[in-house]
Amino acid sequence: MAWFKRESGELDTSGKKTVRTEGLWVKCESCRQIIWKKDLEENLNVCPKCGKHFRIDARTRLALLLDENQYETLDGNLSSTDPLKFVDLKPYSSRLRQAQHDTGLKDAVINAQGKLLGRPVVASVMEYAFIGGSMGAVVGEMITRAVERALDSKTPLIVVSASGGARMMEGVVSLMQLAKISAALARLDKAKVPYISVLTDPTTGGVTASFAMLGDLNIAEPGALIGFAGPRVIEQTIRQKLPAGFQRSEFLLDHGMLDAVVPRKELKPYIARALDFMAA
């Protein structure tokens, strides 16, 4: 038996070295500059040229927010069903399977319990890549469980939102989650357990209309789209041009809808200081 085999095909005798560059560069949608992907990732997925905050997945977000090797994920066994047998361009059940395959998650949120700069916290982080981060029965149940876990342990709660709103494929079951989570947060508030809401790009629809805006402290990342209906829908409805920057986090801060706009690099220490202040 031969130990070595010559690969089939002709040898490249041109003397030219082929270097693959596909996927190594990213174009910033804001400043239109070309960025080396490694530089972008090392800068926490924030454009080093203009400061635009790129969207990041829930696992990356969780790793940035909580201390390394100091947290565990929870409730990851819950999975949505298809109560209405909903079909649009394709069956909802197929959309679920595809989203689960693409993200490696059961649904659009990750629950965790751990430490943030040494401070114990309970966290829920939404995954926009899972059907637009939409909120169905499982998302509602998981966030409610996080609230109740924070309540039982008297541990501060952090929810990071990234969502297009209620999941239409689950109908009224999805809409019920707004009230369910809000009621749980009311119990948390009554017990005087801190709740910090972090709104990222985008946070819209029923998520904005419920738990995302109910924090003791509502923080947003720079440039995040935050609102109920999207700006295009509003313009078509009122037949007027909206102001520049409308529904962006800086606009909302200027008009009293947010407590702070905090860059991604500063978010973790900012929350830590806020928790210390609330505990004082």
Where are the language model's segments positioned?
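Short cysteine-rich clusters marking metal-coordination/redox-active sites
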Residues: C28-C31, C47-C50
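Residues immediately within or flanking Cys/His clusters that coordinate Zn2+
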Residues: W25, L44
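An N-cap/entry alpha-helix motif that binds or orients negatively charged groups
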Residues: S8-T18, V26-K27, F54-N111
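Short, small/acidic-rich helices and loops at N termini and domain boundaries
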Residues: N45-K49, R55-I56
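Cys/His-rich microdomains that often coordinate metals
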Residues: I34-I35, H53-F54
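Cleft-lining beta-strand/loop regions that shape enzyme active-site pockets
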Residues: I110-D189, I196
